[in-house]
């Protein structure tokens, strides 16, 4: 499923980053499942959304939901990532801040334990 998405990513730098991101998430959080919804790979816990990804021409968008974006706004800024209320972007010339990425996933998993809806 993830490979089908990756095969559509035309930018080889972004494709490599996404492959590494997906592999790290699967290693660190093996209980998460993956689904493709709205043409975006998403990591799901017990039927609830944890984080989603998309690839543009020159950046990766990572969407962890608004609550998480607000909670980590300062961290995204310090990492040099462009952010909106719903997502942050990793440009092709930026490194993945692994600590931050894994922290937001762990945060969402903890915050959404027992949550019964897909979105917050």
Task: Name what the model sees in each region.
Residues 1-120:
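Charge-dense, helix-prone N-terminal extensions
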């Amino acid at each position: 499923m993830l490979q089908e998405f990756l095969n559509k990513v035309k930018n080889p730098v972004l494709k490599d980053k996404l492959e590494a991101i997906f592999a790290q998430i699967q290693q660190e959080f093996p209980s998460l499942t993956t689904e493709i919804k709205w043409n975006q790979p998403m990591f799901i816990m017990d039927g609830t959304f944890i984080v989603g990804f998309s690839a543009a021409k020159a950046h990766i968008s990572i969407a962890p939901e608004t609550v998480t974006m607000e909670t980590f706004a300062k961290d995204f800024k310090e990492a040099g990532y462009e952010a909106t209320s719903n997502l942050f972007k990793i440009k092709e010339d930026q490194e993945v801040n692994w600590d931050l990425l894994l922290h937001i996933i762990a945060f969402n998993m903890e915050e959404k334990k027992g949550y019964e809806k897909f979105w917050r």
